[in-house]
Amino acid sequence: MDDAIAISRHDDCPEDAARIVDTGLGEANDAAAPLHEVRPISCFARLSSGEVIGGAVGRTWGACCELQQLWVSPSYRRRGLGARLVREFEAHAQARGCERFYLETFSFQSPSLYRSLGYVAAYEHAVYPHGIVKYVMVKPAPATTPRTSSP
């Protein structure tokens, strides 16, 4: 290793250095995989006034869909809106050809909601303080009834 190289430690993330790392990683990833095929996907719940009171945001790539964010305004929680948003999000992704879904969630977020919608924990990372667990959850798309041709 070159003796002229120094490694620095930080308790924050200097923007200029982080930008260099992000750009370099992006270039390496783009050279290795067709990431231009990754597409954003979302759905939102709005009041008649147009105010957004919830949303599901993610991305699709091939037959895979990642739900990255789910949020419902506190005054509209516990009414089934989160489940409706996830179902609409999944239906939209299935229309794109997605057959598999995944997400990451913490134990203080909504793992029980996702379980009720058919997600299972593929991995549990129980290393955080205060008993907090991070889950990686997966769900296959529902099987469709195969079309049969008429005789």
Indicate residue ranges for each PLM-predicted region.
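Conserved GNAT acetyl-CoA-binding A-motif
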Residues: 93-106
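Conserved active-site tyrosine of GNAT-family acetyltransferases
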Residues: 21, 114, 119
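Conserved acetyl-CoA pyrophosphate-binding loop and the N-cap/start of the following alpha-helix
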Residues: 76, 80-88
